């Protein structure tokens, strides 16, 4: 299935509220005579159908959300959840937690965890020197972020610096390409030598910049020669696209660097990782100034890269510290906590909040649940507590479940289907009783 992302707002975004729905460059309801629709428009405070804007259609928005989530929660004919599209739900201070649409979202989240949640609540504040919670002037705003996949998020404020504002350019952005840096190898090669580690990191960053600049030039040339005809139908060029640099294996970097005395869950490890992410942000900012092109820092998913890095390193450095065992070796993604870290989501949040907030190109924190959350209400309260008390930008709730081809969805992790086992046991007992 194609990798697709759908961003969902429960209230109409500010940049669309006053725009009219159109068809053939005219108002959708132009010359339409329908007394029932006109009466509904008047109930919504409009004197005519042609006076209606997108801001007047929130009831319809919510009906679409409910229908969409009903399909996602049901899954396919086997009860298997759909991998795509990935819905991103924008949680703002105007978000109404007590609507049928919100209930549909959190019923799905409690059962299969389809949604990613963009935090526009806790991320909007900082604590000042007096310990008071005050608005953060540098915070992302709902109109200034676009989620392009399961974690790539683009800061559209950078586009404002190019002139012309966001309107018309928000849907014309993306990433020209991604280069991921293997931090675990750096930790191994430069054990207990931070200066040498950063010197080599600088070399790798320059190589990443050179690679991304060459790719931008190549892709632009191909585009201008007419070799991307479908893209050219909706995209005027790649001027608003970011060059993305990502990182992988921060936890293993710290373990190798410290001789396995520290990891990213310790105070030393957390500070070491945070210092590096801040350093990377500054380097990327300087690349943007040098090249005139947009750059960002992403906690890249690295679904395949994490294994490839680990396997290539194992060939070269037999004693390098890695996650996993035997043939199933890998590096912990970006600056995430190790996979075997405890099951307390709030402990994970406390450790990751500052790190997760440092990326400019997107990141996501998975809060793993051992099984289905008891109810939509309980799931709602969990998400609400997280986004109100933490500033990290992007989270997802991930309940563990199993799928049987015969019985569909089963809460929790099961190697064998308990319902199938019950049926087999019943058959066995029936045969035994007949034999007796």
Predicted segments with their positions:
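Contiguous, well-ordered alpha-helical segments that form the cores/surfaces of helical PPI scaffolds
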Residues: 243-256, 278
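Conserved catalytic cores of very large enzyme subunits
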Residues: 1-239, 260, 266-436
